[in-house]
Amino acid sequence: ALNIGNSSTVQTLIKHDQNNNGLSEEFFGGGTQNGRFVHTGEVINIANESKWVDGMVSSPSPFYYTTNGYGVLRNTWQDGSYDFGATDGNVVTAMHKESEYDAYIFVSAGTDGSEVSADLLDGYYKVTGNPVLLPEYGFYLGHLNAYNRDAWSDTEDIGTNWTIKGNAAYTEPGTTTYEEGGTDYMITAGKNAETLNGTGPSVATDKVPANLMYEKKFSARAVLDEYLDYDMPFGFFLPNDGYGAGYGQNGYNMQGGVGSDGSSSEARLAAVKANVANLKEFADYAAEKGIATGLWTQSNLKPDSNANTYWHLLRDFEAEVEAGVTTLKTDVAWVGSGYSFQLSGVKEGYDIVTDIQNTRPNIISLDGWAGSQRYNSVWTGDQTGGNWEYIRFHIPTFIGQSLSGNPNIGSDMDGIWGGDPVIATRDYQWKSFAPQMLDMDGWGSYAKGPYVHGDPYTGVSRMYLKMKAMMMPYIYTNAYAAANIDTGNGDKGLPMIRAMFLEFPEESYAYTEAGSKYQYMWGEILLV
């Protein structure tokens, strides 16, 4: 039945006790439904909630399907909710807040749940686009923090304490440095300024505080070197992930320089150019070490026409890509509005990287919609780490996201907040069997890195990261299949993280929450 009203349209379909293959009918999809993967008997929201915890939605998709052989993609940008038998066990109702019905309906003649899922996902991809095949480095551990804003000391407690124990025992005191700063911090005279390369600005320096020091040990380069010194397999580095950071200090605290027509003055553009050169110096250094460089997006991708914008925060993404940037993290500061805004944003970033560098980008985003999968991976947002709940709810989240048509997924290692040595180590262990791993540093009670807590934690984390590196041919083959590319293995279109029923479709228990919520197949042959 179809009920089209002034403010909502509801499609009602029969819910069957069994599917065509004699097993219970089960429902999947809906995008990143945190903590859930099978929705039978439940209600899910198709809305950009921008909430990152269990039961909430961080990247919705108006697409669902059933093991009974059909799927529905609503062609809409409007919020909705899908009731898979929670209110009435005999029917499924799919509602969107609009006064029309526009949908794609997919059908499958598959003989089991795995074939049905592959068929319906293939139909979904034909309409919305195949999932992006990330560059290989995107499946290694990445590091994200701000290195162009705060003040540091290794002798004076000026703020947050960060202790690194490295290869020493966890009982040892380690080495502690101290950071003063945070969101939109402005450094003052006479302090040690963090930088990308251990060098200060040279253009538009009128408002740079006096007597600042620029030591390499407080630079992004030094942190990159730490990963390598501790022999940690490592793929990409974002040196500007933090509000008020930027990637150079030329034009520090300078404002103005905008004409009546919105154009920038030569001095304003010179500061941007000098900061891009600073970024290129870092990107070249990272590339020599085999590490890709990326950027976090807080502001426009072009120098804006707002005279109040500090010059050191201005962006020129095309110039950044020419400087070597191939990773882009589009945070809520830029794409938080979701829906078509998110899709347009990630497409713009994708097109710029592919046009200028002629390479596949690593775009990390959230608050997406149907179609986002052809441009970006999904990260699940900002969660508190340091507890088992963080790991628990991410396992079904990853399974459900993968069943929803976006196989490229990741989250912060041990969350962005909090932190605990045991939880962090367990996170490095299990996510070595997952697509993306993000060391989101600078926000928690501990530094975020696999060498932070000392042995045995450092050694165990290293071992699993090396295991992932050794398995990269297997992982990348599965990434090809997940991108809907035929690898000759009979798994075209199946995600990297596979719900148990995708590999064991004859087992009814594999379709259920009880049977598959906390385990999955990592490709065809590895049980996690």
Task: Show the residue positions of the predicted features.
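Aromatic- and carboxylate-enriched substrate-binding clefts and catalytic-loop regions
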Residues: A1-N19, L23-F28, T32, T40, ...
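Catalytic and substrate-binding clefts that recognize carbohydrates or anionic sugar/phosphate headgroups
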Residues: A1-S202, D206-K207, N211, L224-D225
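Catalytic cores of large soluble enzymes that bind and process phosphate-bearing ligands
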Residues: K51-G55, M95, I105-V116, V208-S219, ...
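Aromatic- and glycine-enriched glycan-recognition loops and surfaces
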Residues: V53-V57, S114, W152-A307
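Short, solvent-exposed loop/turn segments at the edges of secondary structure
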Residues: M56-S58, H96-E100, A323, L403-S404, ...
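Conserved, mostly hydrophobic/aromatic
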Residues: F63, Y227, D412, I475
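Alpha-helical packing segments of well-folded alpha/beta enzyme cores
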Residues: L120, K216-V223, F282, D316, ...
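Glycan-recognition and catalytic regions of carbohydrate-active enzymes
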Residues: Y457-L527
